[in-house]
Amino acid sequence: MSISQNKKSYPRLLADIGGTNARFALEVEANIIKNIEIFPCNDYNTVVDAVKVYLNKFGNPTIKYGAFAIANPVVGDWVQMTNHHWAFSIETTRQALNLEVLILINDFTAQAYAISRMSSSELIQIGGNFCTINAPKAVLGPGTGLGVSGLIPCGNGDYIALSGEGGHTSFSPFDDTEVMIWQYAKKKYGHVSTERFLSGSGLVLIYEALADREGIKSAKISPELISEQALSGKSPLCRLTLDIFCAMLGTISADLALTLGARGGVYLCGGIIPRFIDYFKTSPFRVRFEDKGRFDAYLAAIPVYVVLAKYPGIFGVAVALENHLKDYFSKK
């Protein structure tokens, strides 16, 4: 990309679209991101409606290049969100927004790209030693669903971010209690994916299964209330729910670390864990993470980091767009 082309490519439209909220921003210069706004997805019929309201708020700047991270597989032109009603054609959306270039990537691919640029002040380490340089990194995190990605080194300190749907792999129970919880979920849903438990709604599902076992008829409860009751000590059942949630996350994190050979560390993203970070440090997470029989020592050395950065998806999708535009301009 030439200097003149680079200057003319700003501002760039960035979006991180989840099942609950869509975050929008403008990259006004290289690595300078401003005007971050959060829009509830349910308030808008389409993604184009939401974008137009956002851009109108900032004077409808002329934009040629955009990138969206989305909590969904991105295969071909048509996008049907898994955890929301939005469905759209990428090309039709590009035209409706009068963009020259619009790319879409998986939201956790964006999270992974962001991690490649993070400072140590944006991370809290949970156990393990130091990262191995130029080794794969595992990236996952519970939110509306369970996002899963990874960073694979490709030389010169650069990484390729993986795009997948690891949150929808089949859940494997660790002990008798988790077998019971899995059976409860299977009766309700049939196939039980990992994100059935490792998500905001998953926390509620674990609670419901435990309450059912105890013969407790509970009123509808939110993930936030479960966390609050668990941390305050008001509800032993909520505390057990949170313990099991963190233990499950430990097992799944270890599975991903083994699959990728993630000696570069495991990175936990999303808004759930930071809400109870002090509890999480001493929760069953790390013990379960290292409980892998013959590979206990291998996992004990791998550091786990909780990501505290506020908008990693936005910063990650900016990296993806920059990479794409380098190729785009080189071919013009």
Curated annotation (Swiss-Prot):
It catalyses: D-glucose + ATP = D-glucose 6-phosphate + ADP + H(+). ATP binds at residues 15-20. InterPro entries: ATPase_NBD, Bacterial_glucokinase, Glucokinase. It is found in: Cytoplasm. SUPFAM superfamilies: Actin-like ATPase domain. CDD domains: ASKHA_NBD_GLK. Its EC number is 2.7.1.2. Pfam families: Glucokinase. Keywords: ATP-binding, Cytoplasm, Glycolysis, Kinase, Nucleotide-binding, Transferase. One of its GO terms (biological process) is glycolytic process. Signal peptide: none annotated. GO terms for cellular component: cytosol. The keyword rRNA-binding does not apply. Belongs to the bacterial glucokinase family. This is Glucokinase. The lineage of its organism: Bacteria, Pseudomonadati, Campylobacterota, Epsilonproteobacteria, Campylobacterales.
